[in-house]
Amino acid sequence: MPAREYNYVEGFGGYGSLDDDDSDRDSERRNHDLGQRTITTSPTGVSRHAALNRYMIPGRINPLFRPTDAAQPPIVSTSTSASATEPTNRIGPGRIKETPETNFNAFLIAQLTRMEEQNANLKEEISLMKKEQELFFLENQKKLEKGFKDINKYVEDVSAMKEVFKEVVGIMTGERIRFIDHTGENVTPQEAARVGNPSTSTQAHQSQSRSTNWQEYSMHASILAGDPRIKPEPGLSDFENGEYDGNESDENATTRNLPLNNPDSVSNADDSNNQLDGTGNENDIRNRRGCVGTSYKLNRAIQNVTDAAREYFEGLPGQPSVLSLERRYGSTWRRSAKERTLFTKRMTIIKRIIDIKDDPSKYGLSLPENKISRNQAIKVVENIRLGNNTFKGHHCRLSMSQLYEYFSKKMDKLEDYSLTLKRRGKPRRIFLLEEREARLSLQQPHSIPNSSTGTPEHDQDT
């Protein structure tokens, strides 16, 4: 059965049958080509119809496989030469066949039209988005400019406040003399002199601070005086006058090397010491019951490692130990900056004692079974303070602050750690005075003769 031919109708957007064409168009075509013959369908035409069916809209009936009408006349096959010479095909008498290229071109035109519409919509959306982004950018740009202006204003205000604070601090410390014109003011000359001379108030504050510190030091020294195990540190005058004997390195060693927790070490104390011990015990009980821990201050009168270790591990007479305060209160008991600074310095020394006790071989100490007691570790650090050091090129008798500096700046060496005192040092100030005297002697003119003995230069001149 021959398939019915369909033509693309542009007005309705689909394919229509040739039977629906108007009669005027058919008659016009018949009058135009009266001598043409019917042409048989070639395989090439069939393949073109198949290609056209692939581009058909889904849901429509394929015209190549549509059942044919019984009234339609069959297509009469003719010779090949006639199909080659005739450009136009006819189906039945007086009916013109449309080529598949025309339908395919119409389909492409429709698709291109739809793509152009989509492109136009996309262009409109892009332009709208562009306008929105411009508005968003302008709005944020205004906010940023306003924020930068506010920041500049805040910076200027803070700079002005800093300048004011500098002036106030300078006036309070006396670095900047405050100028006030008292002309025409109702003030007394004494008040004007007091206001015009800020150094007076500064000196009064310094003297008051010194008196407070001295009172605090005296109180701490009295606490240390209640313990007969504590030996006072020799003063600078003892070294200058030669009253301090360097051979007394092992004096009172039995008292100092007793265990820190041995109560029998004070058995030779007199009755007054016993009374002090009783008072200390009562104070200890009262302090433990009260809230002494939160108001405790480190003893400023401590001058050696032994007393510092006793304060940390055991506690001074009538006072709790720093170790118990750390375990109970943490860092809340040292509230002021001075206490925190002093505690840091003391803990540097205490940690070195603990480290030596835990691993003595790390510091070159050869001991049986690599074990050392706490008292021996304290003695090692105390020997470093007394002279087993090379603090700035000399064997110095270090203070607690200098010992902290010696450890914190890692100036110590392995040969410094020893249970025996190799060499007793002198205070740092003695070496500084000797160096100063040596410089002054070199700077003196050689022409001035000595009253006792003549110099070689003077002998040559004479």
Swiss-Prot record:
Region (Disordered): 11-43, 66-97, 190-214, 226-289, 441-462
Cross-linked residues, Glycyl lysine isopeptide (Lys-Gly) (interchain with G-Cter in SUMO): K231
PTM description: Sumoylated at Lys-231 and subsequently ubiquitinated by the SUMO-targeted ubiquitin ligase (STUbL) complex SLX5/SLX8.
Biased composition (Basic and acidic residues): 26-35
Pfam families: GCR1_C (PF12550)
Chain positions with Phosphothreonine modification: T254
Official protein name in the record: Transcription factor-like protein EUC1
Origin organism lineage: Eukaryota, Fungi, Dikarya, Ascomycota, Saccharomycotina
Gene: EUC1
